[in-house]
């Protein structure tokens, strides 16, 4: 049985191999002498630290909630598949709801570590491994609000309207 230190080194090796695909990180490693895996782990740890202690927590959380989902949403727009549309449309509805609630009430003062929990929740919603937005759609939005949208799925209806405008 391998020790925790051996397993950690194995994971760092896998991360280093994955990060080797990015020339910028390879150049950073050559320039600074710091292994790219350690640099990325350090930056991620700093990012979490800043969010946990609310040093720019709102900005960093919203940035994380926008960049990766924005990339995947744009990718979904350019694919013919409709499977990913539900995930990303639901994500943006939930993300927008959080943003509106934050602006209406000072939830930050009532709930300690709010931005930490929001950050973890947004990761759960957006990461393809978890597909949390799809889970929320299937378990909450579809059963409660589905009766108001009887003309098929909202994603396919929106796509059909966009295609109709584009062809005119």
Swiss-Prot record:
Where is it mostly found? Answer: endoplasmic reticulum
Which residues lie toward the Cytoplasmic compartment?
Answer: 1-35, 77-86, 125-168
UniProt GO cellular component terms: cell division site; cortical endoplasmic reticulum; endoplasmic reticulum membrane; Golgi membrane; nuclear envelope
- Which purpose does this protein serve, as stated in its record? Required to generate and maintain the structure of the tubular endoplasmic reticulum network and the vacuole. Induces high curvature in membranes and causes membrane tubule formation. Involved in membrane/vesicle trafficking.
Q: Which InterPro entries match?
A: TB2_DP1_HVA22
Pfam family membership, one: TB2_DP1_HVA22
The GO annotation for biological process reads: endoplasmic reticulum inheritance; endoplasmic reticulum tubular network membrane organization; ER-dependent peroxisome organization; nuclear pore complex assembly; response to endoplasmic reticulum stress; vacuole organization; vesicle-mediated transport
The subunit field of the Swiss-Prot or TrEMBL record says: Oligomer.
Q: Which residue spans traverse the membrane? A: 36-55, 57-76, 87-103, 106-124
Keywords on record: Endoplasmic reticulum, Golgi apparatus, Membrane, Transmembrane, Transmembrane helix
Q: Which family does this protein fall into?
A: Belongs to the DP1 family.
Q: How does it sit in the membrane?
A: Multi-pass membrane protein
Q: Does the keyword Transmembrane apply?
A: yes
Q: What is known of its domains?
A: The short lumenal loops between transmembrane domains 1 and 2 and between transmembrane domains 3 and 4 may impart a wedge-like configuration, thus deforming membranes.
Query: Where in the cell?
Result: Endoplasmic reticulum membrane; Golgi apparatus membrane
Q: State the name under which the record lists this protein.
A: Protein yop-1
Q: Which residues lie on this side of the membrane: Lumenal?
A: 56, 104-105
Q: Which gene encodes it?
A: yop-1
Any one Gene Ontology molecular-function term assigned to this protein's record: membrane bending activity
Organism per entry:
Neurospora crassa (strain ATCC 24698 / 74-OR23-1A / CBS 708.71 / DSM 1257 / FGSC 987)
């Amino acid at each position: 049985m391998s020790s925790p230190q051996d397993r950690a080194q194995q994971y760092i090796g896998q991360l280093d191999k994955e990060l080797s695909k990015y020339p910028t990180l390879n150049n950073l490693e050559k320039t600074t002498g710091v292994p790219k895996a350690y640099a990325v782990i350090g930056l991620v740890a700093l990012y979490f630290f800043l969010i946990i202690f609310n040093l720019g927590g709102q900005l960093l959380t919203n940035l994380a909630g926008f960049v990766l989902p924005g990339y995947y949403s744009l990718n979904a727009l350019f694919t013919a598949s409709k499977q990913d549309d539900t995930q990303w449309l639901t994500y943006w509805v939930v993300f927008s709801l959080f943003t509106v609630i934050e602006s209406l009430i000072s939830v930050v003062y009532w709930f300690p570590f709010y931005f930490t929990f929001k950050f973890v929740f947004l990761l759960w919603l957006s990461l393809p491994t978890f597909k949390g937005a799809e889970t929320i759609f299937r378990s909450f939005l579809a059963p409660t609000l589905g009766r108001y949208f009887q003309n098929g799925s909202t994603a396919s209806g929106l796509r059909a309207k966009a295609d109709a405008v584009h062809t005119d």
